[in-house]
A protein has these predicted regions:
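Phosphate-coordination/substrate-recognition cap region in phosphate-metabolizing enzymes
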Residues: 49, 53, 92-183, 194, ...
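Short, Lys/Arg-enriched N-terminal segments with co-localized hydrophobic residues
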Residues: 36-53
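Beta-strand elements within well-structured catalytic alpha/beta cores of enzymes
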Residues: 57-61, 108, 134, 229-243
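Cationic, low-complexity basic patches in intrinsically disordered or flexible, solvent-exposed regions
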Residues: 9, 25, 41
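Cationic, amphipathic, low-complexity segments that mediate targeting or membrane/lipid association
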Residues: 2-22
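Generic short N-terminal amphipathic or hydrophobic helices
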Residues: 19, 44-45, 254
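Loop-to-helix element that buttresses phosphate recognition and phosphoryl-transfer chemistry
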Residues: 65-125, 199-215, 257
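Phosphate/ATP-binding catalytic cores across multiple sugar-kinase/actin-like superfamilies
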Residues: 212-227
């Protein structure tokens, strides 16, 4: 019963989060049609007499290189920390944002150490450790099920390139599940103790990540953007790919070709409907050294498995 209520609540929140901001904006316009809307910190304003929309800034940042990234292991929900290179990438993300005149006023992260540490290092480099922080398991990396902890190259040799590519990059085919009593199952991690075991994933495809991420987007991140915040989301390759798929309306097939470099901020300017104001290639949204970021993304694509 608890699980059923949890799922029902999430679906209700999803629908409510999708409709309320537009509802409020519409009736807010009717109430204040004789005067321009109040300006919001961090948002561009439209001078009186001109038409247009206010924009919100969203920055997505994949965590810096982790120890299991370096070892080419399927990481998933394992709580790998950053390597020295990963710490350097995270620290460099702060100046990259500052150079682009991006100053986050609220932070959202997953519950995993590599994302949390990346966020702290990036904000510390900007002298902005004070910004409010919200964390959610819904921003966690995709759970790789029974593949978690396995070497990607060895997994390819064992199961074949096509099978591993299907597990890794297909939109709706998850890897084999973990058994409930497997010590790798997230129910044994105290940070998820308040969640029912049946809600916690034992394996996920990207479609599953989209489904569990979107309620958090609508109910927690969108309200911060609506309030005028410059929002920084520090998460993982697949949870951020899920969000980018939603923002850029990428097809189920084409999302397989999207690869995110570690430690590179990606900026989106969104209109009041939370749609990107410009259709840009992802590489055009990178902050910092765009060529280095592109090379890093290509390296991700070449990983075995």
């Amino acid at each position: 019963m608890a699980v059923a209520k949890k799922v029902e609540r999430d679906h209700n929140n999803f629908a409510r989060g999708r409709s309320i901001p537009r509802f409020q904006r519409f009736f807010g316009f009717l109430r204040n049609s004789s005067s321009p809307p109040p300006s919001k910190p961090g948002q561009a304003t439209i001078p009186l007499g001109q038409t247009g929309t206010m924009t919100s800034t969203l920055v997505l940042l994949r965590h810096g290189q982790s120890t299991w990234n370096l070892e080419n292991l399927f990481t998933g929900w394992y709580d790998a920390d950053l390597t020295d290179q990963g710490r350097a990438e995270a620290s460099a993300a702060g100046p990259a944002m500052a150079a682009a005149d991006v100053a986050p006023t609220v932070l959202h992260t997953s519950m995993q150490t590599r994302a949390i540490r990346t966020a702290n290092l990036a904000l510390d480099a900007m002298d902005r450790l004070w910004v409010p922080v919200r964390r959610s398991w819904r921003l966690n990396e995709r759970h790789y099920g029974a593949l978690q902890g396995m070497d990607k190259k060895e997994t390819t040799e064992k199961y074949g390139k096509d099978q591993v590519f299907e597990w890794r990059r297909s939109y709706d085919i998850p890897p084999p599940k973990l058994e409930l009593d497997d010590p790798r199952h997230p129910r044994f991690d105290e940070r998820y103790a308040s969640l029912p075991a049946d809600v916690l994933p034992a394996s996920e495809c990207l479609a599953d990540v989209v489904e569990r991420m979107l309620p958090y987007w609508y109910d927690d991140i969108v309200p911060d953007l609506d309030a005028g915040h410059t929002v920084l989301v520090v998460a993982h390759g697949n949870s951020l790919r899920a969000l980018i798929k939603h923002l850029d309306a990428i097809s189920d097939a084409d999302i397989a070709d999207v690869n995110l470099p570690t430690g590179v901020p990606i900026r989106f300017e969104l209109d009041d409907a939370m749609v990107p104001t410009k259709r840009l290639a992802l590489t055009a949204r990178y902050l910092g050294d765009a060529e280095a970021a592109k090379a890093a993304a290509e390296a991700v694509a070449r990983q075995a498995g």
